[in-house]
Amino acid sequence: MSEALSLFSLFASSFLSATLLPGNSEVVLVAMLLSGISHPWVLVLTATMGNSLGGLTNVILGRFFPLRKTSRWQEKATGWLKRYGAVTLLLSWMPVVGDLLCLLAGWMRISWGPVIFFLCLGKALRYVAVAAATVQGMMWWH
């Protein structure tokens, strides 16, 4: 598989992982790190961009579609967002809860600047941690 196609696959997987659809972006990232198809920072940046754009898509959807309070998680996430604001989006990488946080950030009309900054930072830190653990593991085994 060419490097460009591999990077597109990682981007698409990361984008889908930021929605409620399964994307398994961490598995794809680790596989690409192990294959050595591209520099680790290129892979981390690609995964971060895809996942961040997916998260921002959820924020946009939250702005357009009204949400009804129906679940305990939604009430808890709304409380976090009211208390801590956009900083809560550092947790946007978490499965299901992160998707809900992004939707609620849009629904609550939190300012774009802080939303973009904290959402991207949270997602980047996750991929940096996965890549660092993988690279360290590779060095340990060799």
From Swiss-Prot:
Q: From what superkingdom does this record's organism come?
A: Bacteria
Q: Where are the transmembrane segments?
A: 3-23, 27-47, 87-107
Q: Which Gene Ontology BP terms does the record give?
A: bacterial-type flagellum-dependent swarming motility
> Does DNA repair count among this protein's keywords?
no
Which Gene Ontology cellular component terms are annotated?
plasma membrane
Per the record, what ranges lie on the membrane's Cytoplasmic side?
1-2, 48-86
Segments on the Periplasmic side according to the record's topology features: 24-26, 108-142
- Give yes or no: UniProt keyword Transmembrane: yes
Provide the family line: To H.influenzae HI_0489.
Protein name, per record: Inner membrane protein YqaA
Gene responsible for this protein: yqaA
